[in-house]
């Protein structure tokens, strides 16, 4: 049975915390690879802030080019309408029945998981790996993990990783305000954003 990590999100833009989470999950769960899956149209985010999917895809390619166990897939771009994790996991588990999928989420998403579309399918079809931002979050997160595991017979675990306080929203705001985003994300991604005038 292969073990593959899935890193979903808009990646608008991708930054070092995304990469740090993926690498930590790869190591801690002995995964064969991590697949980055950018969303086409997430149901919960305003489309006005979202740059075109081909640019977000290319920025991921730039960011992961030096990591042999990272790859990126555009499978969610080919679906009409909003993008839902449940649909993606149903498609993946049907296509790859001999693979165990580990879906990597931030700690904030753990507390929103039951509000997702068909959360029971998400928790049935994949191990959920939830990243804690720091030790003080552990008790709350572990309590929530126990609650969801019991309620949904889920396989949720805590991913312990040193975290920086960086978000895609923060980077978009810094660009808009003319502030530097150097050292928050790979240099190739920063150059691509500047070249195309994104987030101004």
Swiss-Prot record:
Coiled coil: none
NCBIfam families: cyt_tran_rel (TIGR00125), nicotinate (nicotinamide) nucleotide adenylyltransferase (TIGR00482), PRK00071.1-3 (NF000840)
Catalytic activity: nicotinate beta-D-ribonucleotide + ATP + H(+) = deamido-NAD(+) + diphosphate
SUPFAM superfamilies the UniProt entry points to: Nucleotidylyl transferase (SSF52374)
Listed GO biological process terms: NAD biosynthetic process
Pfam families tied to this protein: CTP_transf_like
Name listed for the protein in its UniProt record: Probable nicotinate-nucleotide adenylyltransferase
Catalytic EC class: transferase
